[in-house]
Amino acid sequence: GSEMCIRDRHKEIFMTTQTQQTLPPSIFPARFQILSGSALKLLACILMLIDHTGVLILANWKPALRVLFTIGSTEVTWYRIVRDIGRSAFPIFCFLLIEGFLHTRNRRKYGQNLLLFALISEIPWNFVFSNTWHHPTQNVFFTLFLGYLGLCALEALWEKPVLQLSCIVGLFGFSYIFHADYGWHGFLLIMIMYLFRTRRILQALVSTLWMNYEWKMCFSFISINMYNGKRGFIQGKAAKYFFYLFYPVHLTILVILRQILFLS
């Protein structure tokens, strides 16, 4: 009866499909939509590796800090170039979080995995910035987990807007004081990208305006608009957990390399 109608309406409003025909309008024509979810995940990991190589290796290597040229008052170094390239990783991960949330068979397990790897990643994250067991900020998995909770609130409470807004404001406040990577800006970016998920061009414009202090992130929406709605080559638990593990493992390797090359 009415309960079935509510569920159907809920599905119609909030769920998207994996088929090419029902993809949201893109900046690019269909022939350029060639990136699967797996390809986007691989790209985001590569960009993140480039970024963190800048943080841990190039920041300590004097040749990478030499000024190549200036643009206005900005001094351009190899370190700066690498960090700017890496800025594109985060919006892609936000996009993949939303896609995963919409299409996963088990949302509770999805959230548990995000929290588990946030906890696992905290030790290498702390060593990245303070080279100790403790650092006042938290890793990006916590940002994604808070975003996941926000998505749960948006969907579960869509018929109770006051309670829904209260939950989002509460999560926003927590993200502000918790100091996870990208902070409250990152949390609200996930909410913005979700709300504009069926309008990719608007999603790109509003997200870029929101994260204007990191304007280099706008380049991530080129690849996001090349998404074809397909899962891609990542199949099975082993491949899935490889990408979860990539974050803490690559941080650990880079921390060890920094210690060997510059701090020992």
Task: Label each PLM-derived region with a short phrase.
Residues G1-I6:
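Short, small-residue-biased leader/transition segments that mark boundaries at the very start
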Residues F14-S264:
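Alpha-helical transmembrane segments and their immediate juxtamembrane cytosolic regions
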